């Protein structure tokens, strides 16, 4: 068993009965997809995510919901710590959001269903041309009002509350859509499914003030990536300092 996978393995075992319900409901909701609107499909995705949260003995505290922009599309950009990250955000974000995920990871059980239910996108890391096409599509969708969840780090390596390198290319969507970027800070999210402890845990989600287009329009993708990372790093350090970490 991989390092830090014991907790996740127990969640998988406990989730097996619910998985049968999930598969049946997802198939019903997606065939044909137009039978169920975006909101109904998103509520099912939230149910799936919330079921996993309960089985992982996780409580998530959410801060800054008032910072989410109104009447416009936007892109959520969180740090990445583990398997629970997207689940926690979907649970806490009342309006439907779509998710961008690496293609191979997106084909796994639960991820596959959540991506379908949220009208998300699958990004092939080995096909640069397809990547550009998908990012353009996301930019157009966000311009038309859709909300997207994108992890600039692209993955996680048991980094816990430490940031990794941000991939500047994903910020193409923001320049194309000219919409706000909402930096999101995840604290202790790794504890939910990427640890060996079976004790209840508490994670935090902090939605920071959005970075408006006027603030980043004169930057290039690398500078914008640095700006978003800096906002997340500052808040993360503040939170860790508050608890004496």
PLM features per residue range, with description:
Residues 55-63, 130-132, 187-189:
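Short gly/ser/thr-rich secondary-structure transition/capping motifs
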Residues 61, 82, 107, 131-135, ...:
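Amphipathic coiled-coil/heptad-repeat helices and related helical stalk/stem segments
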């Amino acid at each position: 068993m991989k390092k830090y996978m014991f907790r996740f393995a127990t969640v998988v075992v406990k989730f097996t009965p619910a998985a049968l319900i999930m598969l049946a409901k997802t198939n019903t909701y997606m065939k044909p997809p137009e039978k169920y609107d975006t909101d109904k499909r998103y509520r099912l995705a939230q149910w799936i995510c919330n079921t996993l949260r309960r089985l992982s003995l996780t409580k998530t505290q959410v801060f800054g919901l008032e910072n989410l922009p109104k009447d416009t599309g936007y892109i959520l950009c969180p740090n990445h710590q583990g398997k629970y990250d997207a689940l926690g955000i979907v649970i806490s974000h009342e309006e439907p959001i779509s998710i961008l995920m690496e293609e191979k990871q997106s084909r796994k059980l639960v991820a596959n269903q959540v991506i379908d239910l949220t009208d998300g996108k699958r990004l092939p890391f080995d096909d640069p041309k397809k990547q550009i096409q998908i990012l353009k599509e996301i930019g157009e969708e966000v311009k038309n009002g859709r909300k997207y969840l994108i992890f600039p780090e692209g993955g996680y390596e048991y980094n816990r509350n430490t940031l990794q390198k941000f991939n500047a290319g994903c910020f193409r969507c923001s320049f194309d859509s000219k919409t706000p970027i909402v930096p999101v800070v995840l604290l202790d999210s790794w504890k939910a499914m990427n640890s060996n402890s079976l004790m209840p845990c508490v994670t935090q989600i902090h939605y920071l003030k959005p970075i408006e287009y006027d603030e980043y329009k004169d930057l290039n993708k690398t500078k914008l990536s640095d700006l978003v990372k800096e906002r997340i790093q500052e808040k993360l350090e503040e939170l860790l300092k508050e608890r004496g970490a």
